[in-house]
Amino acid sequence: PVLSRGLGDVYKRQDKEYPNTPSGMPGVQTIFPVMIDHVNNGKLELNQLINLMCENPCKIFGIKNKGFIKEGFDADLTIVDMDKEVTIKNEMIASKCGWTPFHNYKVKGFPIGTIVNGILVMSEGKILVESKGQPLKF
């Protein structure tokens, strides 16, 4: 009904390949700050968060060389300022959809750096180099 009434645009897959499509509800950019906030509020222990977001997904999905700080594993790390207070805003969202269900949600604890394969790629919210990410190996 939405398309037949002219309320939306249709894109063929070849016109808009992922990741250049406006995806549905975002969460990748906000889940870690929200979860760190739960650590700071005493709802979750830091080691539980590491298990939930780093180690266990790699174990469950069989993702190779990720999820742990170990020799031979990819040096992918997130640097967090546990005391940094941020109010999440739609304008901060890098996803093409441009919004978040956490708009105006205040968090304590925020990522200030990202290291991918040993290279600092984000610092204080600024992308420093073009993505060097590689497809996951299972």
What do these predicted regions represent?
Residues P1-Y11:
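Single conserved hydrophobic/aromatic residue that forms the stacking wall/gate
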